[in-house]
Design a protein with these regions (language model features):
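N-terminal hydrophobic or amphipathic helices/low-complexity stretches enriched
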Residues: 54-123, 355, 573, 588
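Soluble metallo-hydrolase cores and metallopeptidase-like ectodomains found primarily
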Residues: 69, 148-150, 158-198, 275-382, ...
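Noncatalytic luminal/extracellular "stalk/propeptide" segments of secretory-pathway proteins
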Residues: 94-213, 322, 334, 338-339
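Metal-dependent peptidase/peptidase-like ectodomains
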Residues: 156, 269-304, 416-516, 520-528
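Extracellular/luminal Protease-associated
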Residues: 157-276, 347, 378-381, 385, ...
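Acidic/histidine-rich catalytic neighborhood of metal-dependent amide-processing enzymes
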Residues: 223-229, 250, 368, 374-467
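His/Asp/Glu-rich mid-to-C-terminal helical/loop segments that flank catalytic regions of hydrolases
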Residues: 398, 402, 513, 519-582
Length: 588
């Protein structure tokens, strides 16, 4: 599961390629403590294991006690779930980093379990595996950025004025163009906002602030604050490139990112071997500090007005064409590694509905090997995140098999890769599905179900946006739990896990968690502060309640069964923002 973050990714070019990666690798200690205190530590975006390294004295060896607890007998349903986690979160899997040999072994394991559960292959060429070409990229050097105002060129200083962006589409990027300031780079008719109003950016470089104004709703603010979405808007306007500007008062200051300027980022590769980006042909060229922005804008009155407006908390900024040109010369280093999604399907039984597909997802990868903890443990096993979700997916498939009744619609079980790198496996499948795209009618996503307490309710992020909400409420009632409210709506969790890649294709989607009622919030917070994205997220965790895992599986099965057997396909609520934006069924 990805660590908590907002999509106002500051000035990081990484956020353009993958909105999750900034927090994954560059989370400051100050930020970490603040977010953990407010329990925003949700991984729909991954943190580097290094940020959680411990300096405590080595504890006593508890291996014998751990083995006794792990190997204690359980009822069959609990033991079946636990067995999957025992394998997937074992040290032999070395944290299941996407693209690693251990991830590939984990994928083969899931494929074998799909076969045992009676699922038909739904990957490539009659197999359970869908090949996913992962492309890592980073700036090959510091590049050069030169601002010219009034005929006088000024070369910006690396590390003080700018850090370069990588371009997964090209190895070499050369641009020399005028610059237009476009506020936050947002076009939002429902907020009566168009930051491109009155300016022509065709063939120009667009300079924008990161994030979105606080006047936007939580989930929609996360969407509009995404640098990937901003770049896509810039591309639609004909911009030649994007420059991200350090926002005054940013929680992600430029200085914190300089040490990480050349870390590897990741996307998926197209058939030509080039990296996929939402904004094709409009690369994010660089991120500018406040000092760099001052050199770019000089004494432009519009810039002075914009910085004052941001400092004063005013949401609307006036866009303007600057009197400057910017020449950028950048090089990108790339490397390819193959990974795979794992897809199995139960064919539908209703002649009129069997071609429609309900996709159930969970991510298989975790963060791999990292800095040692106090015990010297370097393997970040990812038991809860997300071996537990994969185990739930497999056991849910067995529920369908054991029911003796095929679903009316087809049901696909999809274990995706590289969630921790930016929802990449899910995005690849959503763009390149192994079933007809227009036949995918719903997605239900499982990511890091924390089963350390007896949950009294379930949270279905995104439920209110489509008829899936009514289905979830009816289904969970049959297993004795209610539907809780979003515990942190301002954080926009709806856009922060694999299901969002289906939303972006217009598919009604929900993301399920055990709820926070009763002792849930306290238990969830404890997991985040002691085990989340640490080497201690292991099956030896004495707080894991396997009977609650079975309850979670049963609730998910009932939800999926009702979606698959309903007379009507799921539909977006009429006028819903995401449904309308992505042309989803029922929204217009």
């Amino acid at each position: 599961m990805r660590h908590a973050k907002k999509f106002d990714c500051g000035v990081s070019p990484e956020c353009y390629a993958s909105p999750h990666l900034w927090f994954n690798r560059k989370f400051s200690a100050l930020f970490k403590s603040r977010l953990l205190r407010s329990t925003i530590a949700f991984s729909l975006i991954s943190l580097s294991p290094a940020v959680f390294a411990q300096d405590a004295k080595a504890p006593a060896d508890t291996t014998a006690e751990d083995n006794a607890r792990v190997n204690a007998p359980l009822p069959p349903a609990e033991a079946a779930m636990k067995a999957h986690v025992m394998f997937l979160a074992s040290n032999a899997m070395k944290g299941r980093d996407a693209g690693s040999p251990e991830y590939d072994i984990a994928a083969e394991y899931v494929a074998s379990q799909y076969y045992a559960a009676g699922l038909r292959p739904a990957g490539d060429k009659g197999s359970y595996l869908q090949a996913v070409p992962l492309l890592s990229y980073r700036p090959a050097d510091k590049g050069t950025l030169t601002v010219t105002r009034g005929g006088t060129p000024v070369t910006l200083e690396f590390g003080k004025d700018y850090i370069p962006g990588g371009d997964p589409e090209k190895l070499s990027t050369l641009i020399d163009a005028g610059v237009v300031f476009a506020g936050y780079g947002i076009v939002a008719p429902q907020y009566k906002r168009d930051d491109y109003k009155g300016v022509d950016v065709k063939g120009k470089i667009v300079a924008i602030f990161g994030g979105a104004p606080g006047t936007f709703d939580g989930e929609e603010r996360a969407h509009f604050g995404s640098n990937a979405n901003k770049a896509a808007i810039a591309a639609s306007k004909g911009a030649a490139g994007v420059i991200l500007i350090e926002t005054p008062g940013s929680r992600r200051p430029f200085a914190q990112m300089v040490d990480f300027w050349n870390e590897w980022r990741m996307t998926w590769a197209d058939a030509q071997g080039n990296g996929h980006l939402p904004a094709k042909g409009t690369p994010t060229l660089a991120s500018l500090s406040t000092a760099g922005a001052a050199k770019l804008f000089g004494n432009d009155k519009g810039w002075a007005a914009a910085t004052k407006a941001v400092a004063d908390g005013k949401p609307v900024l006036k866009s303007f064409a600057t009197r400057a040109t910017l020449a950028a010369a950048l090089k990108t280093e790339r490397k390819m590694v193959m990974s795979s999604n794992v897809a199995g399907i139960i064919p539908g039984s209703d002649p009129a509905l069997k071609d429609e597909v309900v996709v159930l997802t969970a991510h298989l990868d975790h963060v791999g090997v990292g800095r040692p903890d106090a015990k010297g443990d370097t393997i970040y096993n990812g038991a809860m995140d997300n071996a537990m979700g994969i185990a739930s997916l497999i056991e849910e498939a067995k529920r369908f098999r054991d029911s003796g009744k095929a679903p009316r619609r087809s049901v696909m079980f999809l274990a995706v890769t590289a969630e921790e790198k930016g929802l990449i496996g899910a995005d690849y499948f959503a763009h390149n599905p192994t079933v007809p795209k227009d036949k995918i009618v719903a997605n239900v996503n499982l990511d890091m179900p924390v089963i350390t307490y007896k949950f009294e309710d379930m949270i279905a992020f995104g439920a209110a946006r489509s008829t899936l909400g009514d289905i979830v409420a009816r289904a969970t009632a049959t297993v004795g739990v209610g539907v809780g409210t979003d515990p942190m709506p301002e954080q926009g969790f709806f856009v922060r896990s694999d299901h969002y890649r289906f939303v972006q294709q217009g598919v009604p989607s929900v993301f399920l968690w055990p709820g926070m009622a009763g002792v849930g919030r306290e238990a969830f917070d404890r997991f985040l502060t002691t085990r989340y994205h640490r080497a201690s997220d292991e099956i030896t965790n004495p707080e894991i309640l396997w009977d609650q895992g079975v309850r979670f599986i049963e609730a998910n099965y009932v939800i999926a069964r009702e979606i698959a057997d309903a007379d009507a396909r799921p539909a977006w609520k009429k006028g819903d923002f995401f449904g309308t934006l992505y042309n989803g069924y029922g929204a217009k």
